[in-house]
Amino acid sequence: MSEKTIAVKAQKVDEVADMFSNSVSAVVADVRGLTVAQADDLRAQLRDEGVSLKVIKNKILTRAAEKAGYQELNDLFKGPSAIAFSKEDVVAPARILKKFSGTADALELKGGVIDRKVADLDTINRYAALPSKETLLQQLLAEFQSPLRSFMYAVKAVAEKREADGETAETPAQETASDDSKSTKAEASDASTTENK
């Protein structure tokens, strides 16, 4: 093997090790049997959510995983291995690959890295069942809005009841101003009476 070839392979190992180090999740899958059209479709779905799919030789994967501190992954690198890397979304690679495997029997998840920790297939499958980040944010927003909406309805109901009962809803500031006005008038009246005496 020439020095140039060794240097190229070392550079490739460094690149893949950086992918592992810079990703919050990386899911390993067996892609044997996927058609070109299926592979293109899968790549497009992953790319839409900021996930990159790489098919890498097992020797390079093994060295790169060791360099990144994920040597426990080495048992997964048998047969043609593809890895879906995500730098931001912990759930997306597992969710998209799992969903795609439902329509493409040839795709098989093996394991990977979730939140920078080595994860077995059961863990990958649990994460795959979670909704997308956008859906989670929408659900969280709905949870926050629900109590606020209930409070607003309650305030409105109280106001409507007061109106129906013929009450005037004075604000505390108005009540205080009214009390101050009465108090000032009373003091002026007392002063006037004292002067007349």
UniProtKB/Swiss-Prot annotation:
Protein species of origin: Oenococcus oeni (strain ATCC BAA-331 / PSU-1)
Gene behind the chain: rplJ
SUPFAM superfamilies per UniProt: Ribosomal protein L10-like
Biased composition (Basic and acidic residues): 179-188
A Pfam entry, by short name: Ribosomal_L10
Name of the protein described by the UniProt record: Large ribosomal subunit protein uL10
Chain positions covered by the region annotation Disordered: 162-197
Function text: Forms part of the ribosomal stalk, playing a central role in the interaction of the ribosome with GTP-bound translation factors.
Family (UniProt): Belongs to the universal ribosomal protein uL10 family.
Segments traversing the membrane: none
Key words of the record: Ribonucleoprotein, Ribosomal protein, RNA-binding, rRNA-binding
Assembly: Part of the ribosomal stalk of the 50S ribosomal subunit. The N-terminus interacts with L11 and the large rRNA to form the base of the stalk. The C-terminus forms an elongated spine to which L12 dimers bind in a sequential fashion forming a multimeric L10(L12)X complex.
InterPro entries: Ribosomal_uL10 (IPR001790), Ribosomal_uL10-like_sf (IPR043141), Ribosomal_uL10_bac (IPR022973), Ribosomal_uL10_bac_type (IPR047865)
GO cellular component terms listed in the entry, alphabetical order: ribonucleoprotein complex; ribosome
Gene Ontology BP annotations: translation
Example of a GO MF term: large ribosomal subunit rRNA binding
